[in-house]
């Protein structure tokens, strides 16, 4: 665990975590902290969120922003509360942007971590939100929704646009149930 950012080590100690789980170790081996794009497919409660946290803290230390995309407002609120509690004392400013789809949300420029839904991200892109110029990490939680008939095409287009807008950003896709993770990994 010595290679982890100090903020992560402190946070894990407070939570009583003394060692990483296999998916977390594998993600580090595959380049998590070197900015490599990753698809993390592992069971529920196996530590996928911590993988995203390690990346977002690493980007925070390098003055980059992380865009954390979730499918539901309730999940966005849950992540917001959790991350704010864990990392607020370390100076990482967390924002929740799930509301009005007809504005730019300029306030997001002053935040390090922006948690939002796919639909709100789409709106922020269409309104040319200025914070995007500093996004260096994009986390897509529940990426298996790409296989969903109703939400999948929209999510696929959103990821494609983000990859074009942010060609040097690190993309991390998280799922417990994705079936075609190797194909998705090649695409990212």
Locate predicted features.
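Conserved ASCE P-loop NTPase core motifs with emphasis on AAA+ ATPases
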Residues: 1-11
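Conserved P-loop/Walker A NTP-binding site and adjacent catalytic elements of P-loop NTPases
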Residues: 9-11, 15-188
């Amino acid at each position: 665990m010595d290679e982890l950012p100090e903020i992560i080590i402190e946070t894990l100690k407070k939570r009583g975590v003394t060692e990483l789980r296999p998916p977390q170790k594998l993600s580090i081996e595959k380049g998590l902290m070197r900015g490599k794009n990753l698809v993390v497919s592992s069971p529920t409660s196996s530590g996928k969120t911590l993988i995203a946290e390690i990346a977002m803290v690493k980007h925070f230390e390098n003055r980059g922003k992380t865009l954390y995309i979730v499918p539901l407002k309730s999940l966005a609120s849950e992540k917001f509360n959790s991350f704010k509690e864990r990392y607020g004392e370390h100076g990482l400013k967390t924002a929740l942007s799930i509301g009005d789809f007809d504005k730019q949300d300029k306030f997001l420029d002053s935040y390090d971590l922006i948690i939002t839904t796919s639909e709100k991200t789409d709106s922020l892109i269409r309104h040319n939100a200025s914070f995007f110029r500093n996004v260096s990490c994009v986390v897509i939680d529940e990426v298996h929704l790409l296989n969903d008939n109703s939400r999948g095409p929209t999510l696929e287009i959103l990821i494609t646009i983000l990859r074009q807008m942010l060609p040097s950003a690190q993309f991390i896709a998280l799922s417990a149930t994705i079936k075609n993770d190797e194909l998705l990994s090649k695409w990212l």
